[in-house]
A protein has these predicted regions:
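PLP-dependent amino-acid enzyme catalytic core
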Residues: 1-490
Length: 490
């Protein structure tokens, strides 16, 4: 089982090395060339627990022993999620909603970032690497807190998270600023998420920087979905949700379903593509964007162009113009053509745009659909679904639900991925339903609970009473300097 870089066929690593390194030296992402060679036996997995399905999926992507995989899964999830099924499926009138927000930070990132630290620890042991790992992560809001919580006080790891100072919700910012753990550091930057993510990627290919870290017995890795170890765990909930529908006789085994996915960085929906490649019967993967609809434009025209205004929306975790994981999809759709991917990514870096061939676009359209919703439509959808189904959506899930309603498919069951608790974006959710009078986010959190009776997640209840521990704000150009200065604190 060998991983290679999307941009260079000669850069090959085993699974443990790929998880630890995160990003290839020249900037490519690690992929399995023969993805789909081995398939899941779905019939055998019907009625199995989340843990058992996760073990079966991991076997297709890592070279760990049965015992190692089982231990990773158990330590990642047992007792850490508020629902025994980890990612429960809820039936509404038009579709099913896959609730991915029952983890320790109330966002879907918890699923991947609870397992990644366990995969990292196991990989360190397997490759007999004596260096510690520095996790560098950019976040548009949810990844940061989930990564901090996942890696908090994990032996031989240090983690630094960078977020756009004015580009996350009040709750998201407070979650990160109050983070505990002796190996954690959080810093805001003046700029947007793309600035933070680009800064991190540049450090991964900065040989001088990596040598300086190595002199301190430290190696770089990432908790973003550019790390294959973050992406693999997300494949599991696609499989689990499908098997749930089969087990409860909502569909028959081998019936195809649609998945509607709110996404900015393309990682969450790419996990659905991986699930389809290992045998899941998928009709369409529907990509739902907000007004930063660079992915919608690409999936409908074949032109990816980030040369546009960056818009702040009520779904800030999707306020992204550079969708990193699209590179992995293009690698597979192009027939694993590393040179072609290298050229596209060079075009993107130099001109801010690239265009794929008609053949590649047709292959993408065979499996993917796309839609988008603006802020007004998002808030209208929150109100409509609450009134119709007595179900409370967060802003990102509402984007996906609006796209679902615009593309209703009566022939196939549809599953909408719900990526966060509505309480992470309380002001936007509350004002979609009720009048506001200038209250702060935490006051509105309690008012939303009083009005809807939807339970506030335990990790958010007293968030405003926690001590602010991380107050640093820097210019985006100063990330490298900041990291080297603060390493000694971890």
């Amino acid at each position: 089982m060998i991983y290679e870089s999307t941009r260079d066929i000669n850069r090959k690593l085993n699974p443990s090395e790929a998880i630890l390194q995160g990003l290839s030296e020249e900037g490519g992402l690690f992929v399995l060339r023969d993805l789909g060679k081995n398939k899941l036996d779905l019939e055998k997995l019907i009625g199995k627990s989340y843990y058992e399905v996760a073990e079966a999926v991991l076997h297709l992507f890592v070279d760990f022993s049965d015992e190692e995989i089982k231990k990773c899964v158990e330590e990642a999830y047992r007792g850490k999620f508020s629902h025994e099924n980890i990612t429960p499926l809820v039936g509404l009138k038009d579709s099913y909603v896959l609730e991915l927000f029952n983890g320790p930070t109330s966002a879907f990132k918890d699923v991947g970032l609870s397992l990644l630290p366990q995969l990292t620890k196991t990989a360190l042991t397997k490759v007999e690497d004596k260096n510690d790992i520095l996790i560098l992560t950019a976040t548009s809001g949810d990844t940061g807190k989930a990564a901090l919580e996942g890696f908090k006080d994990v032996d031989r790891t240090k983690i630094m998270v960078f977020y756009p100072n004015d580009g996350v919700s009040t709750v998201q910012k407070t979650q990160m600023q109050t983070q505990e753990g002796k190996n954690t550091k959080v810093c805001a930057i003046h700029g947007n998420f793309d600035d933070a993510q680009s800064g991190i990627k540049e450090l991964f290919v900065d040989e001088e920087f990596k040598k300086e870290l190595l002199s301190k017995n430290i190696k770089l890795s990432s908790a973003n979905s550019i790390n294959i170890g973050r992406l693999i765990p997300q494949v599991v909930y696609y499989v689990v949700s499908y098997l749930d529908l089969v087990h409860t006789n909502k569909i028959k085994l081998n019936d195809k379903v649609n998945f509607v996915v709110p996404t900015g960085n393309f990682g969450n929906i790419l996990a659905g593509y991986y699930a389809e490649q290992i045998g899941l019967p998928v009709n369409k993967l529907v990509c739902a964007s907000n007004n930063n609809n660079v992915l919608y434009d690409f999936l409908t025209t074949g032109v990816y162009d980030k040369n546009r205004d960056f818009l702040k929306t009520v779904s800030p975790s999707m306020d992204i113009l550079i969708s990193s994981n699209l590179e992995r999809l293009l690698y597979y759709i192009s027939g694993c053509d590393n040179a072609y991917i290298a050229k596209l990514m060079k075009d993107l870096k130099e001109s801010g745009r690239f265009e794929v061939t008609g053949e590649v676009l047709d292959k993408i359209k065979d499996k993917f659909q796309a839609g988008f919703a603006d802020d007004e439509q998002t808030k209208e959808t929150i109100k409509a679904i609450y009134e119709k189904d007595n179900y409370l959506l967060d802003t990102h899930t509402a984007v996906a639900y609006k796209v679902l309603l615009d593309n209703l498919d009566n022939e196939h069951a549809s599953i909408v991925l719900s990526t966060a608790s509505p309480y992470k974006f309380t002001e936007s959710v509350y004002s979609s339903l009720f009048e506001t009078h200038g209250e702060d986010e935490f006051t509105l959190m309690n008012k939303l609970h009083e009005q809807t009776k939807v339970v506030i997640p335990e990790n958010l209840r007293d968030l405003d009473k926690k001590e602010i521990r991380h107050k640093d704000v820097i210019n985006k150009e100063d990330m490298k300097k900041y990291i080297l200065e603060k390493l000694g604190d971890l």
